[in-house]
């Protein structure tokens, strides 16, 4: 069956699905803002369920993604003094802990097809939320819990390489600068080591058939071009410098010394 490009049926279907799901989570403190269901815990930590109708950037209509997120202000803003006042709600893309419902439950990206029964889709979403999402929301409902248990839920946290950095932000907001400084420096040293390993041993990148990539080989000092004869992973000996430079700037803003690393 072809996917309809008519936006009206899919929009109506998502309206039905969202209303059914919202009626289920509303007693738990969630409030609806457009396609976002949002609640605050511990005063300013956001927990978010977002309904994404299609993927316009890729020209994919007729599919529904359910995106999930948790936003800790200092982690998302990368500062010890987050901005005030709080907004009424925050979007999933503004969260620092993010995943999708399908990745959380199945470990892969499986959107819903909106030409199926909206009521059945909503029932499936509620079942998965009840079994796999709301219990995690209830555990990761405070800064203490996030520091202690975040790494227990890797499927819930597709940005989990930032755990140390964001723990530093939490400790910094609490006023424990030595702990924040130590965690930040550990993360910075980890990134430097990963960059060194990528330069010496290579790192994998995915290219579609026919794609090409020109880069500076850090082992030879020469520019090389990789042409993908088939879709798959290719090894390059180069590690981007941008994230390391960003961390240097952030350390300067936070008055964290990076000497002797």
Where are each of the predicted segments found?
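A short acidic/basic microdomain associated with nuclease active sites
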Residues: 29-43
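Intrinsically disordered, low-complexity regulatory regions enriched in serine/threonine/proline
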Residues: 2-13, 39-261
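Amphipathic alpha-helical segments
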Residues: 10-32
């Amino acid at each position: 069956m072809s996917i309809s490009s008519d936006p009206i049926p899919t929009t109506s279907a998502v309206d039905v699905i969202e209303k059914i799901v919202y009626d289920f989570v509303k007693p738990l403190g969630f409030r609806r803002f457009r396609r976002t269901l949002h609640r605050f815990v511990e005063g300013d930590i956001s927990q978010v369920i977002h309904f994404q109708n299609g993927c316009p950037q890729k020209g994919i209509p007729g599919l529904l993604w359910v995106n999930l997120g948790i936003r800790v202000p200092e982690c998302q803003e990368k500062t010890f003094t987050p901005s005030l006042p709080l907004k009424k709600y925050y979007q999933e893309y503004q969260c620092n802990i993010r995943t999708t419902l399908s990745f959380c439950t199945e470990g892969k990206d499986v959107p819903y097809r909106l030409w199926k029964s909206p009521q059945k889709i909503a029932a499936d979403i509620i079942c998965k939320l009840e079994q796999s999402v709301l219990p995690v929301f209830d555990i990761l409902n405070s800064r203490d819990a996030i520091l202690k248990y975040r790494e227990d839920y890797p499927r819930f946290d597709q940005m989990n390489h930032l755990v140390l950095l964001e723990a530093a932000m939490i400790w910094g907001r609490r006023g424990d600068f030595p702990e924040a400084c130590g965690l930040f420096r550990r993360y910075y040293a980890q990134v430097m080591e990963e960059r060194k390993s990528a330069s010496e041993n290579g790192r994998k990148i995915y290219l579609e058939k026919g794609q090409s990539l020109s880069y500076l080989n850090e082992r030879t000092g020469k520019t090389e071009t990789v042409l993908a004869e088939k879709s798959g992973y290719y090894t390059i000996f180069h590690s981007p410098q941008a994230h390391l430079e960003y961390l240097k700037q952030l350390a300067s803003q936070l008055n964290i010394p990076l000497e002797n690393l």
